[in-house]
């Protein structure tokens, strides 16, 4: 069981990742925080909570990503339209990454300096019908991917369509019967439900 104290209470588990000896848990319901617990004994270690809109602060975390390559934790705040980078070990703030456009639904970090975002289709077509956008840390769009079906306008399903399986980045778009793998800067179908 996880430690329960005033500082470690949470209202929901919206995302959960395990890395090394730690559990990273996102609660958007009660605390607007990423909480960190020990995998060995469930003890609460620390948290970063939504406290404001200054440097290193967020209001409503939507999702997070652990970059295993550089030891960083990224937190997406859709309300403030910003992506924040923290040190994975001590949760010290490191940088703010500029988004290519307002309010992506999800993101990941496929390689250092590159950010892959998932955007819903909108009335104003921002990316030529594509839903996945690769951008640099300044928010400059490098390339776009995935011709979205009409159902791409419906915001329902997994809020974190990116995941790593057997060391490979995978993507599962909303309402899709396919799973894609990020290979050589492109999305390739790796599994399809028939």
Positions of PLM-derived features:
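Asp-box/WD-like beta-propeller blade repeats and closely related beta-sheet repeat scaffolds
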Residues: 77-129, 144-151
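Repeated scaffold domains used in trafficking and secretory/extracellular systems
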Residues: 12-15, 59-64, 102-110, 153-161
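A conserved active-site cap/scaffold subdomain adjacent to cofactor or substrate pockets
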Residues: 157-180, 188
């Amino acid at each position: 069981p996880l430690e329960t104290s005033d500082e470690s209470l949470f209202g929901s588990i919206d995302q959960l990742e395990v890395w090394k000896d730690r559990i990273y848990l996102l609660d958007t319901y009660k605390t607007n925080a990423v909480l960190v617990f020990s995998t060995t004994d469930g003890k609460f270690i620390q948290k970063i909570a939504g406290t404001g809109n200054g440097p290193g602060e967020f209001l409503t975390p939507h999702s997070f990503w652990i970059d295993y390559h550089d030891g960083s934790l990224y937190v997406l705040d859709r309300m403030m339209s910003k992506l924040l980078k923290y040190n994975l070990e001590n949760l010290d703030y490191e940088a703010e990454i500029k988004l290519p456009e307002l309010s992506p639904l999800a993101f990941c970090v496929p390689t250092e300096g590159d950010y892959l975002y998932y955007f819903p289709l909108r009335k104003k077509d921002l990316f030529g019908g594509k839903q996945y956008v690769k951008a640099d840390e300044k928010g400059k769009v490098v390339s776009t991917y995935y011709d979205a079906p009409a159902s791409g306008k419906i915001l329902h399903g997994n809020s974190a369509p990116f995941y790593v399986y057997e060391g490979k980045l995978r993507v599962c778009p909303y309402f899709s019967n396919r799973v894609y793998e990020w290979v050589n800067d492109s999305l390739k179908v790796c599994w399809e439900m028939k």
